[in-house]
Amino acid sequence: MRIINRLSFLLITFLLGYSSVYSQTQADVKMGEILNGGDLFQLRNEYPNLRDSVSIKMLNLIADTQLGIGFNKLENAAVALDSLLLHHQNEMDGQTSIGMAALQGMNFLNLGMYEQAGKVGESLVNALKNSVPFEALYSFVFMEKVGNALANVPKPYLERPDLDVAVPMSVETVGRGKHIYIPVEVNGITKNYIFDTGCSFGNFVSEKYAKEAGLKIVADSIPVSGMEIGFVKLATADSMKIGELVYHNPVFMVAPPDNEIDSVFTFDGVLGYNFIRDAREIIIDNEAGKYIFPHKVSDGEPNMYLSSNTPRVRINYDEKPFDLILDTGNVKSDLGNKFAEIFPHAIEGLAEHTTSRGGFGGISQITAVTLPKFCFKAAGTTVTLYDTEVVKKAESSNQLFSGSLGADFVLSFKRLAINYQNMFIRGE
């Protein structure tokens, strides 16, 4: 859903136009620079000191929106978005208004306010369907179709005992890396799901499993993006159980069979964003071979934020901050062309080779180099990963991809806490 991530870029155009009409204070200029820079950690640190000095109220509302979405304070983001779209439409150009509406629609989906999300998606589709290609429209179609199909479905919620809950984990070798699994029971059927922070909405399951588990199909032709844009069905269940945790009203994307992918590996399900977020904190204890869901959530300073429902972790490499996607469903960490551009010395002299990447929509061949040792600071400690591929060219020449921390990153720790309540990871 790349469209909901365009806000930072749209702001640049808006602020340049805005300054020609209104005089700006120093605080306004500084706030605009921070917002356009797109560094949420800088915004979080400097916003409290700037807020009262900013004369353009809309800038504060945009900051509240970005911080609310990025640091998982969805209700705060909802209030700011409502105010922006109700009272500041005339101060925004068309692209910025679209970006704000898209953020609001996705925020509605994440809050379980499906009917409202469907209406926002429908409005965006109707406004744009005759002027933009489907590749620019599909995320709004997703919003419309999912919101409308779930309009009468209660929002999901987690029921749990007042104690720590432990659930066994398992690890299996897949291709060039590993998958980390967690047992999930739906309608009396227990299967191992891939534990995947990179799955950005609901859960992702195979069509075969959906039939076996008796999932209720509520819609089809839902567009999603993987290796390419494809279509899935949408399904629901009354609940799913993970140990002593009961997650009510879960949502599932049901993928059709794919002979190319199925020839490499098969899967039943992928546990995604909504449950992981609502669990608040999950400790992956690799030594004990289990997941721990603590009753009391840990405190900590953020080193992670959400972008399109996917966590991005701030690491430090070569004494510089760098953000990587935390994608526990990726069998092995990889680095992208953004890393190659910022740290060219790291890959200098490394031989290029062909490698493959797979996911929903198929398998593609790409050119990469292999970094023998990737040493960086993250999660409160020093981490070393081995034989990390660096993809020097993205599929789109305009696209900069930073990279992702995959299963090998998770398994490099004795224990790794993933905390969505306070937006941090911490390892030992």
PLM-predicted stretches and their roles:
Residues 1-28:
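Bacterial Sec-dependent N-terminal signal peptides
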Residues 23-428:
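Pepsin/retropepsin-fold aspartyl endopeptidases
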